[in-house]
Amino acid sequence: MNAMIVLLGGLAILVIGYVLYGGWLAKQWGVDPSRPTPAQEMHDGVDYVPTKPYILLGHHFSSIAGAGPINGPIQAAVFGWVPVLLWVLIGGIFFGAVHDFGALFASLRHKGQTIATVIAENIDDTAKKLFCIFAYLTLVLVVAAFASIVANTFAVNLANATEASNLANQRTAMISVLFIVVAIVYGLATRGREIPTAANITIAIAIIVVLVAVGYNFPLISLDYTTWMILLGVYIMVAAVAPVWILLQPRDFLSSFLLYGMIALSLIGIVGASITGDASNLQIPAFTDFYATNAAVDANGNAIIDPATGKAVMNKAAASGFLFPALFITIACGAISGFHSLVASGTTSKQLDNEKNARPIAYGGMLIECLLAIISLCAVGFVWTKYCAGGYASPTAVFAGGLSQMLACIPGLENIEGIAYTLLILAVSAFCLTSLDTATRLGRYMFQELWVPAGKSMDEATGARKVLTNPYVATLITVVLGVGLGMTGYTIIWPLFGAANQLLAALALLAVCAWLGNAGRNNKMFYIPMVFMLVVTLTSLVMTLQAKCTALMAGTGDPFAAGVQAVLAAVLFVLAVVLAVKGAKTIFGKKKAAAE
């Protein structure tokens, strides 16, 4: 494939999708720029804070991005570039962006409450409770995983660590800590001040350049994994209850320019290397097979055997399984991800200053992720042979390795590969941290909503419910569970996260579809995405259950891990069916009164 054609062609399609389909959705749903938003009507200076759209886009995009749009396409590249590109474009425009935009808009019309409240008011309270439990446990898993990932990225003296890897981790930790400290100062300094957009952006970019330079050249922090896990627990505890304007908004706003810079650097690398001829034809096959393995192979397609063990070498950056449903589970954030609905209806909806900005922030933010997914596909294509041979420890390493090598192909930039690789790794790590504290705040919201009495507000809770809906109590429980799981072995249940995340997406689509139907608005654009994602999720869960039960009966692998995964897969399957039936009765049955 020609990298530049794929990149620019994909970008053009995404822009057309935003203008035409995104604009059509806004008209169909009745987006009203004159209508006050929850941030204006319920302004409390903590969670509900009207925010300028370009600042809110920084928070929203930083929170939903993480490593997802990078990891998914690179892992799924084993199926070929055509299936990946088609799903990113079709899934992004007609599934993911609709999902994100719909979740944000529904939350706006439900006082900035989460998807759980949308379910309670448009399906029933039992469905809400089930969704809350499921979403909360998923968020705890996200907190555990991201805390562990960030701690591993910051820590020194890890197993098999080299002096170079320790130094890279110290630099990443130093820059990230500087970001947090400066973000607080920036939030305090700009609070209540009307700073022109151009000046604000210029200041933000200047701050980023200085922070990266200082952190890169003065990596003064040197802590081990356990210490970082404890410190991260303290940090997210504070971040989840602090007013959004003092840390969440400024830190994510500053961090977003790191991501924008990463995208710009990637575009320069791909276009530049394509023009020079070094990357005009990337080596990924258009299509490989309907079944893929993650066994490493050489340039001739032969399995690579480790001479020390006599076993096949595995490609740690690749997915495996049947194209359906593996492709649609693996490529999550690059096409559609349930986590986005929690962000859109959790933090973003409480900060939106005008309904007209819902489309650029939610629909547009998703399509920017699609662009990042296409960039990731180009990156893996440039290092395809090494990728297939299992030469990379992670998809993030593939991404940074491919793009830094592309940049080095441009005349005059031959010596930039090393620093470009470090900066790209840093950018990805920074967004794992933003996703971590956003997930903690979302976990707090979901835990609080779980204990709200049916038909009442949080303020009306009494007794034990009043204690459990307290933001500090909810946050403490979430942090203890998340960090505790991260330190004791979240990897046992992590293989189910992909299916759980896409089940969240299916249920969010179902909730918004039910609300629009009850409100008398066109909801038919949700039918195909909703049903498709349910089928994908249920198929994946059935295949997981079958595989784990087979392993248990055969006595192969870790029986404890297989047993836990089998039970959880069965529980998720039942949950999906129950909520799907309840949702279908609402959508196709008697309509309920709904928020306008």
Ranges and model annotations:
Residues 271-313, 367-403, 438:
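Extracellular/periplasmic helix-exit of transmembrane alpha-helices
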Residues 10-20, 135, 139-144, 206-211, ...:
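Selective recognition of specific alpha-helical transmembrane segments in multi-pass small-molecule
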Residues 49-110, 121-125, 142, 147-158, ...:
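Membrane-interface helix-loop-helix modules in multi-pass membrane proteins
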Residues 13-70, 256:
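Membrane-interface "cap" regions at the ends of multi-pass membrane proteins
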Residues 1-17, 204-255, 268-275, 299-300, ...:
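A generic transmembrane alpha-helix motif of multi-pass inner-membrane proteins
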Residues 2-19, 76-107, 116, 171-179, ...:
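Extracellular loop-to-transmembrane helix junctions
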Residues 2, 69-70, 82, 141-163, ...:
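Transmembrane helix-loop junctions in multi-pass membrane proteins
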Residues 125-140, 364-371, 416-420, 449-487:
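Loop-to-transmembrane helix boundary motifs in multi-pass membrane proteins
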